[in-house]
Regions:
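Conserved short "hinge" loops at termini or chain/domain junctions
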Residues: 1-99, 126, 133-150
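Mixed-charge, glycine-accented linear interaction segment located at domain edges/termini
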Residues: 117-126
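Elongated alpha-helical scaffolds
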Residues: 105-113, 117
Length: 150
């Protein structure tokens, strides 16, 4: 990597709350199946090992999220207190970034994208799946918009 390329990257450290993301994921699930009876909802999903699935997909989706915003993960540290420290290298004007807002949007993205991946093996309806896809896209657009601000 040449020096000009290195100068375009900035380091950003963000602390994400895994429990908050898990709660957001469950809220997304409630939204997707809102108004359905228990028989109509994809209950196979509820019978899955959600905490286990969440842990695996969460770490995968962190990498996906970072590549989508034009950066890469330098370091991830999952602490016992439920926080994940992510040190990112991203290409963006970093001066005016609202860290609280971008953290919330990242949590939104991770919650919706992890849930979307959980839905793939179960019998969710096309509408439910499209709702999750649109919510992940909306969160990612918001992240990119925040990072693009000078």
């Amino acid at each position: 990597m040449n020096m000009n390329t290195m100068e375009n990257y900035r380091t950003m450290t963000i602390m994400l709350d895994r429990e908050q993301i898990y709660r957001a994921m469950m809220a997304e699930y409630a939204l997707v199946v809102a108004g359905k009876s228990e028989e109509e909802a994809p209950m196979q999903y509820a019978k899955c090992d959600l905490p286990g699935i969440f842990k695996v997909l969460y770490n995968e989706e962190l990498g996906v999220m970072c590549s989508k915003i034009g950066g890469y993960i330098e370091h991830i540290d999952d602490s016992a207190d439920g926080l994940t420290e992510i040190r990112l290298r991203i290409t963006a004007g970093m001066a005016a970034i609202n860290y609280a807002l971008i953290r919330r949007r990242m949590e939104d993205y991770l919650a919706a994208s992890v849930l979307m991946r959980c839905f793939v093996p179960v019998r969710s309806t096309r509408r439910e799946y499209e709702l999750l896809v649109s919510r992940t896209r909306l969160a990612m657009r918001s992240i990119r918009h925040i990072l693009a601000r000078e």
